[in-house]
């Protein structure tokens, strides 16, 4: 008979305690379902924080990984291999704006590369260090490394890591007047923005906001950097979220769904900056390894397909309708916001701060969700989510919601 000491959870004390994972050990997955080591099934509407865009155990990704694993895993960037070269070409072609690509291992690394590229470009223009400011937006999230967490305009992620790097300025999201004022001094080299803030509460850019940011960047000869790490790769119904605003960026950062669950990141550079970094200006040991690139090529091809785009639009409407029906019954939400399959259900004031409690009850009923702060339930399921999976997820959410509202 197994005991608690036999569970992998007994080893959790070896982890640096920077996470608060649920006391569940997930063992396998298929589509939008996962099973724990006790055999219990869960419907997964979190997709590893918007990473598993094709669900779990996608056969095409497994085949690509298995085939490449039998050939070559790693060379470092002192040699060429075919998968990253082909991936770079395919990303440039798919992007509609980029000329060059830098491949790395994560979203944070992609954003670090973007920050360095901005600074290098400003330097190449003869701008002194005090005129290389990067503007970001309150509520943003750009990563955990020191420069990217400084770009992340949320004090809770920065506390205790001072002194932070200089040269960043924060303004309120969707506030054009505030951005105009922040750029008026002529010291801004770039504006870095998420088309939809993820960790900031699933908050979309207001209609026309990205176009105004682009215009201000043009006016002040500043770069536009779009962080599409969470909202990109088909999640909003188009391969890139900014396509829906018809703006052309100078730099785009990607990760998460690009690898379908295998770690990879990418920075895409447009013509204005594509030649800025030359030999030795930046680098990575593992970035663009043939194993990750082989998987990402297949993920990109599938995520860019019309079938995925159509499914995202259809399931987004169905998920919204399901959440609205729940709200009509239980009065839990003040607002449903977001685009595509990146939706946030904002809790009504009387339920403020209870997102975590609702997630606990959802897990009890076999549903895996995320929160985006204490007041928002975040839905970022696989983009190939089926009708049956969504219906099952909504049914489980209804059970969790009913139990929540019945509590004294």
From Swiss-Prot:
It is found in: Cytoplasm. Its EC number is 2.6.1.11. Its cofactor is pyridoxal 5'-phosphate. The modification N6-(pyridoxal phosphate)lysine is found at residue 256. Pyridoxal 5'-phosphate binds at residues 107-108, 141, 227-230, 285. Pathway: Amino-acid biosynthesis; L-arginine biosynthesis; N(2)-acetyl-L-ornithine from L-glutamate: step 4/4. N(2)-acetyl-L-ornithine binds at residues 144, 284. It comes from the Bacteria. Keywords: Amino-acid biosynthesis, Aminotransferase, Arginine biosynthesis, Cytoplasm, Pyridoxal phosphate, Transferase. May also have succinyldiaminopimelate aminotransferase activity, thus carrying out the corresponding step in lysine biosynthesis. Homodimer. PANTHER family: AMINOTRANSFERASE CLASS III, SUCCINYLORNITHINE TRANSAMINASE. Belongs to the class-III pyridoxal-phosphate-dependent aminotransferase family. ArgD subfamily. This is Acetylornithine aminotransferase. It comes from Xanthomonas axonopodis pv. citri (strain 306).
């Amino acid at each position: 008979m197994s005991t608690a000491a036999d569970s992998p959870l007994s080893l959790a004390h070896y982890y640096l305690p920077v996470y608060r994972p649920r006391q569940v050990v997930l063992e396998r997955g298929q589509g939008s379902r996962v099973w724990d080591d006790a055999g219990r099934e869960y419907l997964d509407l979190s997709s590893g924080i918007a990473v598993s865009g094709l669900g779990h155990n996608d056969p095409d990704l497994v085949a690509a990984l298995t085939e490449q694993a039998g050939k070559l895993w790693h060379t470092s960037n002192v040699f060429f291999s075919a998968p990253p070269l082909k991936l770079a070409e395919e990303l440039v072609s798919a992007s509609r704006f980029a000329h060059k690509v830098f491949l790395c291992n994560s979203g944070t690394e992609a954003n670090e590369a973007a920050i360095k590229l901005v600074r290098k470009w400003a330097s190449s223009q003869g701008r002194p260090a005090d005129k290389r400011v990067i503007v970001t937006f309150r509520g943003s999230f750009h990563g955990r490394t020191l420069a990217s967490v400084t770009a992340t305009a949320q004090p809770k992620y920065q506390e205790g890591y001072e002194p932070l790097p200089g040269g960043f300025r924060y303004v309120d999201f969707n506030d054009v007047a505030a951005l105009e004022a922040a750029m008026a001094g002529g010291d801004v080299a770039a504006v870095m923005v998420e088309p939809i803030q993820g960790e900031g509460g699933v908050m979309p850019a207001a209609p026309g906001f990205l176009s105004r940011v682009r215009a201000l960047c043009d006016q002040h000869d500043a770069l536009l950097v779009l962080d599409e790490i969470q909202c990109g790769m088909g999640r909003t119904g188009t391969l890139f979220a900014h396509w829906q605003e018809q703006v052309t960026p100078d730099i785009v950062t990607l990760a998460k769904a690009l690898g379908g669950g295998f770690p990879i990141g990418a920075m895409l550079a447009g013509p204005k900056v594509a030649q800025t970094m030359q030999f030795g200006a930046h680098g990575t040991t593992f970035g663009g390894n043939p194993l990750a690139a082989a998987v990402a090529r297949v993920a990109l091809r599938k995520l860019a397909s019309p079938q995925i785009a159509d499914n995202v639009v259809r399931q987004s409407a169905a998920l919204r309708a399901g959440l609205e029906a729940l709200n009509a019954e239980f009065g839990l939400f003040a607002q449903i916001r977001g685009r595509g399959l990146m939706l946030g259900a904002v809790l009504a004031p009387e339920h403020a701060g209870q997102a975590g409690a609702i997630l606990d009850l959802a897990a009890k009923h076999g549903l895996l969700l995320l929160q985006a702060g204490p007041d928002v339930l975040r839905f970022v399921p696989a983009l190939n989510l089926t009708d049956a999976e969504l219906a099952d997820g909504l049914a489980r959410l209804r059970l969790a919601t009913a139990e929540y509202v019945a509590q004294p």
